[in-house]
Structures are given as C-alpha cells and as structure tokens.
C-alpha cells in the first residue's frame, strides 16, 4: 500500500470514528429528551436530518449495526400482568367497540389504571387516552384506587376536548371504578356513551394497556420512585413527552398531539391478523 493510500485510509477511518461518536451523542441526547427506550427505527427516522446536517450518511440497516456495536439496542421486555376488580354489583355495560376501529379523534376514549411503586407504597395512575390519535387526554395520580381517581382523570379529559360537540364512546374494563354510578352518570351527563370489555382479552382494551406499558418502561415509572410528589412530576413530564415528542408507528411516525389536531391518517389496529376491521359509526 502506498503512503498516500495509507493516509487516505487512515483519514477515512478517523472520520468514521468521529462520526460514530457524534451519532452516539445524538442518540443519547434524543433518548434523554424523548424516552430512554426509543427504538432503532424511530431513532433513524427522527435523527436522519441531523445526520445529514452533520455530514453523516447512514442507512437504516447500517444504523442498526451501529446501535448493536455500541450496545445501544433496547432489550425486549416481558409482558406484565394486570388485575381488575370486577367482582361487584354495579351495572356492567356492553362492549360497543369490539372488532371496530375509530376513524376520527374524540370518537373513542379508552381508560385504565396502573400502579406506580414508591418508597412509601403503591400509587395509582388513571389514564384516559384517545384511541384514534393516541393522545393522553386526562390523567390522575394518587395513593388510592377509589372512583374519584378515575373521575378526576375523566374530568381533565373532558376539559381538554378539542371537538366537544362530537359523539364519544368511553371504553374500559369492568372495574368497580368505571361501573360506579358516580362515574357513569358523570360521563353520560357530558354526552359520553359507556362501553366495557366482556372478558379478559388483551385486545379488548389493548390501547389503554399499551399506553400504561409505554409510560412505565420508557419514562422511568416502572422503577420504585422516592415519593408521590416525585412520581407526579415524572408522570407529568412523561405525559407531555408522550403526547408532543414521541412518534408512534401506528400514527405513521407522527406525534399524538399533531394527529389529534390534524386527523388525516387511517387507523391501524394492533391486531396483526385483522387489519381491515370495520369502522365505528357513532
């Protein structure tokens, strides 16, 4: 090898190493800002313009190899188990949305409760999410699971409506909080129709459970948090990032807040074998 070729090769290798250090920094900064569990496809989609601006040319496959080489791939997480107390005497409503999909924002809301561990014991997070845009419309964190927890989350969601005159279905499991007449009456007084799961099928409330999982695994809510005040601050930050900064495959790598205001996408079901489900007609 000639001296000229040697130095050219050395310069190329040096540039590659510098580019890799730049990309490592970009990936870490993006994950710190948006979510520590952001995967490779989303990273490449969100950072490709930054790479171009930095003079870095890298396709998706090579980017995956780069992530693997630098131990930046996200390990797969195990499924978690949810429990619902449906052993009560309250009225249980029919499932109005089974095997149907929404075609606009504020046509279908899904609600669920998850727990957040703190050093002082469990806290509970009630969420109301728009099924079409995936935007979290309302939430409430507290140290109890009483009906008021879910009522406060629903009240926030109603306050945050962008299309208040549209007909809306509220879908949840059959937990006593959602079946409580205080909750159902409040929903119905605000023009909301109740719908509930019929049995434990993960697809019957898949969106709500997926949101729970995302918040816990991507934004640090899975770990034991010092106290309720810190848990609330972390939840507020997580919801903001989830709604405004995090891209979603089901939204064609757009963000929930954007889709909620600019609803021009076709809904994608989480059911892999049922991609052409009929649309809701409410």
Give residue ranges: language-model regions.
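Short, flexible loop/turn motifs enriched in small residues
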Residues: 118-124
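Basic, flexible linker segments flanking DNA-binding modules
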Residues: 3-105, 255-264
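Two-metal-ion RNase H-like nuclease active-site motif
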Residues: 97, 107-116
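C-terminal domain-tail junction helix/linker
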Residues: 188-192, 214-282
